[in-house]
From Swiss-Prot:
Coiled coil: none annotated. Residues 327-365 are annotated as: Disordered. A zinc finger (Phorbol-ester/DAG-type) spans 159-209, 231-281. GO terms for molecular function: ATP binding; diacylglycerol-dependent serine/threonine kinase activity; protein serine kinase activity; zinc ion binding. Residues 1-107 form the C2 domain. This is Protein kinase C theta type. Residues 635-706 form the AGC-kinase C-terminal domain. ATP binds at L386, G387, K388, G389, S390, F391, G392, K393, V394, K409.
Length: 707
């Protein structure tokens, strides 16, 4: 296998060449590839292949051998212009490797001029030259892990589009007019009108967002419903002390005429915020929101009380008979024991009075509740750190009661809250609780929490992930890649049958057990309730794997998982990503417009599978249209036996013991396994009820954990 560079030359600039003054240059270039050889006369370069004359803005291929150089000569057809430069192909390939497989540079020519050169790195099975020297140098596109991204969650309240925001300067809430405390993303800010608020004040916003308050829908709404139409009387004002805008919450800058002040209510705003302030002069939004909430709760209580009467005044409904009345009342009263236990470990277990309320529960349920409330991080010994990120850390832990080993994923509550990922965390827990129904999904034992952290206790898969293994062998052979792809298909189809779109399929998230079977992990990006014609439009995923319909802002369904599956198979078979770019903008353009490169040595069935997976029309993509199991690449697969794990994997990872960590990145294993410190002020002010339904134990694992 020999790597090669696909090179393009363009944009020749002759500079200040005297011979070019007043003349049309009309240049052309000649490319001479020379080999380094040792001779009796010493070291020298010899040209073994014919000279190439590539047209401008076209491409040509040059294979990489150590010592091989490329001489580029530019000549003029109409003038005496000769410029040249020499490029070492090995150094150019190294530059491409550091820039995600491609590079773009200006070449300075001698004696004058310059030109733009684009180069892209590829692998090909055409030369028989030994590639060991290049393997040692790491000429591969898959040389680092890639993190997922997700569009900020948008809270739509009264036409506002609030997103969690980090305020780099002191900011005040436009609802309660108090300071927005905290680190990271302290509060919400509207993307349309820039109104800043506390996260806790989002339910107290009564003014609709329109960008302008003059004759706005919001003003008309209050005028018709509440008879409120009080425009502010703003006038330019000179502030003698630091003052904050009561709309966007930031400081009014300047020495004079810094902002506007309302003569009636004294509201202070920026000049730029004047047109975005609602006509609510003299109205306290916080108090009005509380009053409206009280009225609503009073009306609900009154309607509930009225429903208990047999006859009603006004428009008459048929009176409910006594038997119906008795049947409808109990659902209004919470049933003891039916509510999911809080599971907060710093609380003491339920006392006897709570246990005696209501009918006695089965013995298994009581054991589960007791264990769920008592389980804490001190029940585990943290041996190694397997990975970490902005979310938290993953540990290899030993359960003290049974001396069994688990992988514990610890999330920091303050980070989850700041990133507005509470619901994503709950989705991950629910998907993991379903994983026991399928052999190729990571199984979760239980979840519990402390005041600072959330913990997922999962099976420890000591075979490592596919990204770790592909970095050592650079690509998988056809039988191995086909086996992994088939097991991933079964896992994806199970998730899709449950109405779950995975949205983060990549090498990093495919783990191996000790026998060599795959397990899909990390369900934090999943979307639930996607059965039938349901679609979503959240922008999320790992950049290299994102489907074009996501980039185009279109609504999508499980079709995006089959595009990501195509990228996964391409990387397993070829050893590099199908789409490239120096930054995300170029990468996304490549995903939308470019066709992947297929080496000549790629098997016909594998290429056909990839072509059908990389169809940009979601409804025509394989997996959405047609049965992917029937593709010729999988003709040797017995799907029933595969799902029962009756087929031996082609590769078995080296595992020395149940707690072996040799298949994980060494950079994490060397760190001390300990929990990160949380923001104490934020933790103390946090509403812990947001995580009240987090704690969970899988019923199928009660005996194992309690033994």
């Amino acid at each position: 296998m020999s790597p090669f560079l696909r090179i393009g030359l363009s944009n020749f600039d002759c500079g200040t060449c005297q011979a070019c003054q007043g003349e049309a240059v009309n240049p052309y270039c000649a490319v001479l590839v020379k080999e380094y050889v040792e001779s009796e006369n010493g070291q020298m370069y010899i040209q073994k292949k014919p000279t190439m004359y590539p047209p401008w803005d076209s491409t040509f291929d040059a294979h990489i051998n150590k010592g091989r150089v490329m001489q580029i000569i530019v000549k003029g057809k109409n003038v005496d212009l000769i410029s040249e430069t020499t490029v070492e192909l090995y150094s150019l390939a190294e530059r491409c490797r550091k820039n995600n497989g491609r590079t773009e540079i200006w070449l300075e020519l001698k004696p004058q001029g310059r030109m733009l050169m684009n180069a892209r790195y590829f692998l090909e099975m055409s030369d028989t030259k030994d590639m060991s020297e290049f393997e040692n140098e790491g000429f591969f596109a898959l040389h680092q892990r890639r993190g997922a991204i997700k569009q900020a969650k948008v809270h739509h309240v009264k036409c506002h589009e609030f997103t969690a925001t980090f305020f780099p300067q002191p900011t005040f809430c436009s609802v309660c007019h108090e300071f927005v405390w905290g680190l990271n993303k302290q509060g919400y800010q509207c993307r349309q009108c820039n109104a800043a608020i506390h996260k806790k004040c989002i339910d107290k916003v009564i003014a609709k967002c329109t960008g302008s308050a003059i004759n706005s829908r919001e003003t008309m709404f209050h005028k018709e419903r509440f008879k409120i139409d009080m425009p502010h009387r703003f006038k330019v004002y000179n502030y003698k002390s630091p003052t904050f805008c009561e709309h966007c919450g930031t400081l009014l800058w300047g020495l004079a005429r810094q902002g506007l002040k309302c003569d009636a209510c004294g509201m202070n705003v920026h000049h730029r915020c004047q047109t975005k302030v609602a006509n609510l002069c003299g109205i306290n939004q916080k108090l009005m929101a509380e009053a409206l909430a009280m009225i609503e709760s009073t009306q609900q209580a009154r309607s509930l009380r009225d429903s208990e009467h047999i006859f009603r005044e006004g428009p008459v409904e048929i009176g409910l008979p006594c038997s119906t009345k008795n049947e409808t009342r109990p659902p209004c009263v919470p049933t003891p024991g039916k509510r999911e236990p809080q599971g907060i470990s710093w609380d003491s277990p339920l006392d006897g009075s709570n246990k005696s309320a209501g009918p006695p529960e089965p013995e298994v349920s009581m054991r589960r509740t007791s264990l769920q409330l008592k389980l804490k991080i001190d029940d585990f010994i943290l041996h190694k750190m397997l990975g970490k990120g902005s979310f938290g850390k993953v540990f290899l832990a030993e359960f003290k009661r049974t001396n069994q080993f688990f992988a514990i994923k610890a999330l920091k509550k303050d980070v989850v809250l700041m990133d507005d990922d509470v619901e994503c965390t709950m989705v991950e827990k629910r998907v993991l609780s379903l994983a026991w129904e399928h052999p190729f999904l990571t199984h979760m034992f239980c979840t519990f929490q402390t005041k600072e952290n959330l913990f997922f206790v999962m099976e420890y898969l000591n075979g490592g992930d596919l990204m770790y293994h592909i970095q050592s062998c650079h690509k998988f052979d056809l039988s191995r890649a086909t086996f992994y792809a088939a097991e991933v298909i079964l896992g994806l189809q199970f998730l899709h049958s449950k109405g779950i779109v995975y949205r983060d399929l990549k090498l990093d998230n495919i783990l191996l057990d000790r026998d060599g079977h795959i397990k899909i992990a990390d369900f934090g990006m999943c979307k639930e309730n996607m059965l039938g014609d349901a679609k979503t439009n959240t922008f999320c995923g790992t950049p290299d794997y994102i489907a074009p319909e996501i980039l185009l802002g279109q609504k999508y369904n499980h079709s995006v998982d089959w595009w990501s599956f195509g990228v996964l198979v391409y990387e397993m078979l070829i050893g590099q990503s199908p789409f490239h770019g120096q930054d995300e903008e170029e990468l996304f353009h490549s995903i939308r417009m470019d066709n992947p490169f297929y080496p000549r040595w790629l098997e016909r069935e594998a290429k056909d599978l990839l072509v059908k997976l990389f169809v940009r029309e979601p409804e025509k993509r394989l997996g959405v249209r047609g049965d992917i199991r029937q593709h010729p690449l999988f003709r040797e697969i017995n799907w029933e036996e595969l799902e029962r794990k009756e087929i031996d994997p082609p590769f078995r990872p080296k595992v020395k013991s149940p707690y072996d960590c040799s298949n994980f990145d060494k950079e994490f294993l060397s760190e001390k396994p300990r929990l990160s410190f949380a923001d104490r002020a934020l933790i103390n002010s946090m509403d812990q009820n947001m995580f009240s339904n987090f704690s969970f134990i899988n019923p199928g694992m009660e005996t194992l954990i309690c033994s």
